[in-house]
Each structure stands twice: as C-alpha cells, then as structure tokens.
Amino acid sequence: MERKYRNSFALEVKALMADGRFAGYASVFDNTDSQQDVMRRGAFAKSLTARRYPVQLLWQHQWQNPIGVIDAIFEDQHGLYVEGKLLLDVAQAREAHALLKAKALRGLSIGYSVKRARRNPDSGARELLEVELWEVSLVTQPANAAAQVTVVKAETDYCDVLMAALRGAERVLLR
C-alpha cells in the first residue's frame, strides 16, 4: 500500500460563520494537481462508509495540532464536501478563523493512502480510484494552484449558501 500524507485540491469554502462553522469542498474531482494526481468520483466511497473513527480536522497536516471537528463529509458530483467547525477555544483554530476571514488562508488539503490507482496513458497523470481518507487540513500552501478559498461569507449569508446547496442537490437528484 502506498502512503500519501498530503494532497491539495480545489477548495471552495461556501460559508464561514462567526462561531467557526464552515462548509466547502476538500477535494474536487477530475482536477490534476501539481503532483499529477487526479481524484476520481467514488474514490472516497469505501473509506467514508467503513470509518470507525471521525475524519480529523488538522492544521497544516500536523497530527498533534487538531483545530476542529468535521460534522459532515460526503461525496457529491463535484467532489468531497465537508461541513466542520473550528474549535475557537484552541489558539490555532482562532488564528485559522481570522486568516480565513481575511482571505489570507486559502487552502484545504487531504491526507490519505492510495488503495487503487491507474496511470492515464495520454496525460501521464495518476488517476486515484480508491483512497483511504485520514484527515482534512487547512493549509497555507496547497499543492494545487486552484486549491484556494473562493468565497467566504458572513453569518447572515449562510441561508443563501444552504439554499444554493439545496438547489444543487435537487439538480443532481432530478438527473
């Protein structure tokens, strides 16, 4: 089994609330990163259903530095969607929250091990078909240039975010 401790994918933080709650994508499918890896739909499915422990929310992939909790995590058509909460009693989580609000911190990254992959003969990229997810981290320097926070909304905008997510889910279900 090949171990891979970190990899960054496009992140879209859809909301950041005053109490530290956030929602967004920790991994986006079909996006080639700087390490020539492409996460494919379904890659997280087995790992998420077989979990015996929660996915950790870490600072910069540092196992000794948890900064919050993941409340919900699942695959949709776009990628790996997460909802979490920074624990603002933790100093590093408060700093991360301030950096996110100021848009100084822009990346999310995942720690995982590769269970099944194949090489794309045309592009040379490694397509990740099955991974075991260990953790989600807030990071300052993601491996993928597209791995950045695109939207940070205030608490009053959270209802708009939820409505947009519901509309997106409705489109997927009606297909």
Task: Describe the predicted segments one by one.
Residues 28, 61, 137-140:
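Residues at the C-termini of beta-strands that transition into short coil/loop
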Residues 35-36, 66-68, 119-121:
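Short, solvent-exposed polar/charged micro-motifs at secondary-structure junctions
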Residues 1-3:
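Terminal, non-catalytic protein-protein interaction segments that mediate quaternary/complex assembly
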